[in-house]
């Protein structure tokens, strides 16, 4: 049977993979956004696991809020990336960093 520890280990592995993805690839903005989304999904998995283990629905409510914020963040982030790519013809973090005033 799959217990709480299995879900927590899986959530920790997903979180660690996303942290490694952020630290190893700091050039491409799309990969950074995907790593942040993976991090949020790992947190959601832990919330769901604890919610099921404790028989409390508060964790599931938090997951809905996190998914809503993550969807809005993805939509806004991708819209900004499309505008930057149209203007600069690149999505490299170093080139976008040169936009500072």
From Swiss-Prot:
<keyword id="KW-0874">Quinone</keyword>
<keyword id="KW-1278">Translocase</keyword>
<dbReference type="GO" id="GO:0048038">
    <property type="term" value="F:quinone binding"/>
</dbReference>
<feature type="transmembrane region" description="Helical">
    <location>
        <begin position="61"/>
        <end position="81"/>
    </location>
</feature>
<keyword id="KW-0830">Ubiquinone</keyword>
<keyword id="KW-0813">Transport</keyword>
<comment type="function">
    <text>NDH-1 shuttles electrons from NADH, via FMN and iron-sulfur (Fe-S) centers, to quinones in the respiratory chain. The immediate electron acceptor for the enzyme in this species is believed to be ubiquinone. Couples the redox reaction to proton translocation (for every two electrons transferred, four hydrogen ions are translocated across the cytoplasmic membrane), and thus conserves the redox energy in a proton gradient.</text>
</comment>
<dbReference type="InterPro" id="IPR001133">
    <property type="entry name" value="NADH_UbQ_OxRdtase_chain4L/K"/>
</dbReference>
<keyword id="KW-0812">Transmembrane</keyword>
<dbReference type="GO" id="GO:0005886">
    <property type="term" value="C:plasma membrane"/>
</dbReference>
<dbReference type="GO" id="GO:0050136">
    <property type="term" value="F:NADH:ubiquinone reductase (non-electrogenic) activity"/>
</dbReference>
<dbReference type="GO" id="GO:0042773">
    <property type="term" value="P:ATP synthesis coupled electron transport"/>
</dbReference>
<keyword id="KW-1003">Cell membrane</keyword>
<dbReference type="Pfam" id="PF00420">
    <property type="entry name" value="Oxidored_q2"/>
</dbReference>
<dbReference type="InterPro" id="IPR039428">
    <property type="entry name" value="NUOK/Mnh_C1-like"/>
</dbReference>
<feature type="transmembrane region" description="Helical">
    <location>
        <begin position="4"/>
        <end position="24"/>
    </location>
</feature>
<keyword id="KW-0520">NAD</keyword>
<feature type="transmembrane region" description="Helical">
    <location>
        <begin position="30"/>
        <end position="50"/>
    </location>
</feature>
<comment type="subunit">
    <text>NDH-1 is composed of 14 different subunits. Subunits NuoA, H, J, K, L, M, N constitute the membrane sector of the complex.</text>
</comment>
<keyword id="KW-1133">Transmembrane helix</keyword>
<dbReference type="GO" id="GO:0030964">
    <property type="term" value="C:NADH dehydrogenase complex"/>
</dbReference>
<comment type="similarity">
    <text>Belongs to the complex I subunit 4L family.</text>
</comment>
<keyword id="KW-0997">Cell inner membrane</keyword>
<keyword id="KW-0472">Membrane</keyword>
<protein>
    <recommendedName>
        <fullName>NADH-quinone oxidoreductase subunit K</fullName>
        <ecNumber>7.1.1.-</ecNumber>
    </recommendedName>
</protein>
């Amino acid at each position: 049977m799959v217990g709480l520890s299995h879900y927590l280990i899986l959530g920790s592995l997903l979180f660690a993979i996303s942290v490694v993805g952020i630290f190893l690839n700091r050039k491409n903005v799309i990969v950074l956004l995907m790593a942040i989304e993976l991090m949020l999904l790992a947190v959601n998995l832990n919330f769901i696991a604890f919610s099921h283990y404790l028989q409390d629905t508060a964790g599931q409510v938090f997951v809905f809020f996190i998914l809503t914020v993550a969807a809005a963040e993805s939509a806004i982030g991708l819209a900004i990336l499309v505008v930057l790519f149209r203007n600069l013809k690149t999505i490299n973090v170093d080139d976008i960093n040169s936009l500072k005033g």
